[in-house]
Amino acid sequence: MPSWRDPIIADLTAPGTRLLLAADPDDLLLDESVLRELQGHDITLLPFEDPIAFRTVYEERHRPGMDGNDGGDNAARLVVVVREDAAIDRLPYDLLRNGRRVSFGLAQIFPSLSYPVVRSLDHADLDALHMAYMRQPRAVGSHEPPVLGESATRDFLLRYVFDIDQSGIVDAEDLLAMLLRQHYGGRHLPAELATRLLEGLSRDARFDGWPLDHLLLDRRFCMRFLQERWPLFLDRLAVAGGAQLREPSVAYMEIPGPQALPFDQADVRPYIDSLFLDGLLQPVAYPHADDAIRTQGWVAVGIESDPAADRERRIARLLDALERELPAGDATYRAWLQYAPRWAELSVQWHLGSTPDAVGQRFHTLRARLDVAFLAWLEARYAGLYSQAALSPAMVHRIPPFLTMERQQLPQRPLALLVLDGMAMDQWAIVRDVLARQRPDLQLTEAATFAWIPTITPVSRQALFSGTMPRDFGATINSTSRDEAGWMRWWTEHGLPKDAISYQRSIRNAQDLDTLRQHLDAHQRRAVGLVADAIDGIAHGMKLGMAGMHSQVRQWAEGGFLADLLDLLLDRGYVVYLTADHGNVEAQGVGSPAEGAIADTQGQRVRIYPSEELRGTVQARFPGTIPWPSVGLPAGYVPLLAAARSAFVSTGEVIVAHGGCALEEVIVPFVTIERRTP
């Protein structure tokens, strides 16, 4: 079936003008597949945002040959991108004289649907929408289906994009299956679609008493709702198996709503298995386990038995899933963002203790496959990530633009960007579970994002706070003290006065919290940037490998510092966005290059050289090292990454480090934290 991308690609690759001026209000040109296709035709996109920065790049890299449009149909082309049609008229005269105007937008692709509603979708949902749109009947002589208003468009999207047919939700099984499809699949339901769905469900008397808004919008709340009702479901099975209950489990439920849920129904049960597997639901100690299992054997997945056996069983099931779901070479970046949290869950379980040899062999084999697959994917696709536009940022430098859009929606609500320096996804899984026990009223919206490679603080954290790519801060790329300047510059350029912006780093203890509290209480800050570096400090001092790392991170989280920091911010009305600048990985030493002063940066997982020639001399002595391309990096910044899970330290030494391109270093959490309203 044709794709919505086809007319865009056809227009941009048509023979003729080498310079095109494109209005792209919906960021369609930043779609991953569109970018890949354009790169295959040697077509470069150059956004026109800052006129001075644009002119510098244009003159240095693209101007030669553009004025005369010479070079033939197969010559490299440039697409200058602006946000709207009218902005093309404001481009410099030399571009207007030589360029051809084009325009692409969702309103052109889906003219029969309400544009504001369609625009709320993530680009990942456009394929499903286009397929459904093309299948709609047309009147004789018409190329488009009948026009739908806003409400009808919302219903259309709910049904055909999110597989939610409100008329088909008639009982608890239907409702629960719909909720589980959304939450387990990680689907983002736009706010106006969620509102439309809630309006319909709230009018249905069959769902009176269900906390529908929280169940639909808050995955963690939905999991707590299920967790509390799981023992009650086991009660019912145990009674059927002959047990006599002294005290029903319902007495311990806190979340309102129906007490009995149809966990065993055909559309629900497969999700329950997976939720226990992924750690979103926790097995419970149940006194009548034998009776419940006798009735329905599958419920054993949600009942504690022998802790060691439970752990081995869970590791085996995670291995089954991860072996099956390892992303292929043509996978989208979203596939890796979805894979990383499940790999993190396996890592947490794996490092809790020993396992049988056969299980260990499976783990190490899968990890080797993962390292090869992820590196191959990065080498092929990482270059297209930096400009991705999505409802959740694809890379850390896209976080400030994302926060700016969030602030436009709620301009009166202050925001805080909290960076837990060096926290990998597996460590977030530990911290998250501790937080859930300490502060059950927290509402966490979890996502993930890519760090910059090399995964070191001066590169990735500076990009994170400045909202720019490393090539734009080449003069300070070796500094760890420029985050505040980048953060201040971003927000002043986006409309905030300096006294409404704040930044504080190295937040570690109660005294630092007191300082922050006094600072926030004395000034009305609208955008606060914070760095807590305890986890990175643990990593750099770790001599016990990842098992020791996990143990100390758990101790740190249980100490309550992070919970207190979140309380401080949430009590003052902030919405908190928690992320990391990079992760970390357990690595084994292969020796340190005796390179004298030729390396500008001598890290444990990366060396930085001023030229490819100098890098090559070291690479020749360390087979398997990775000459990382300078994608998005400044000239004269040439990285050499350690191979796989190795490090440039004494041979055989085991450390926890970062700087390379392992999955655990590159993909980091991005979590929105709010306090759940009653």
PLM features: what roles do these ranges have?
Residues 1-415, 422-576, 580-678:
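…; additionally, a secondary subgroup of soluble metalloenzymes is captured
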